[in-house]
UniProtKB/Swiss-Prot annotation:
Pfam families: Phycobilisome (PF00502)
Modification after translation, per record: Contains three covalently linked phycoerythrobilin chromophores.
Family recorded in the similarity comment: Belongs to the phycobiliprotein family.
Protein name as annotated: C-phycoerythrin class 1 subunit beta
Gene Ontology cellular-component terms listed: phycobilisome; plasma membrane-derived thylakoid membrane
Origin: domain of life: Bacteria
Protein localization: Cellular thylakoid membrane
Originating species: Synechococcus sp. (strain WH8020)
Amino acid sequence: MLDAFSRSVVSADAKTAPVGGSDLAGLRSYVRDGNKRLDAVNAITSNASCIVSDAVTGMICENTGLIQAGGNCYPNRRMAACLRDGEIVLRYISYALLAGDASVLDDRCLNGLKETYIALGVPTQSAGRAVAIMKASATAHIGETNTPGLGGKRFRKMETTQGDCAALVAEAGAYFDRVIGAIS
């Protein structure tokens, strides 16, 4: 796993040159937006259980056969495994967002995930749909476009650094799309 700093050093070392120019400008931008990045990761991790449970619920509402006898979310242990997998995927996406690099997501989460799901008989289309729902929820939390809806007292609006988070929303969205692409 390489963070933005390590990537710049490795790149400069490969060119046998000091870190400078566009690499240095990229690092300045990374540091300047660091608090926004931390707030984005905090928004995901603070709401992780809600994001995952809502995604699994949405997936099941769209395919009720998953909770019937023989379905992949029946009995309880399979449902628990589904929730656990969603939390693991979300955790690695938050790691990638914090580092500003997808290598940790690719190496430790996505490598062999589709093959594992196929071997276990997990419907990859449903898993991909759950990740798409997680993407919608997580990016709403990052971009602060989440609304109380039916959440009532459970709704939390995070205190975050002011400024445009569109780039972080897009980056997080790209990580979710990477997961969807890997399991579809």
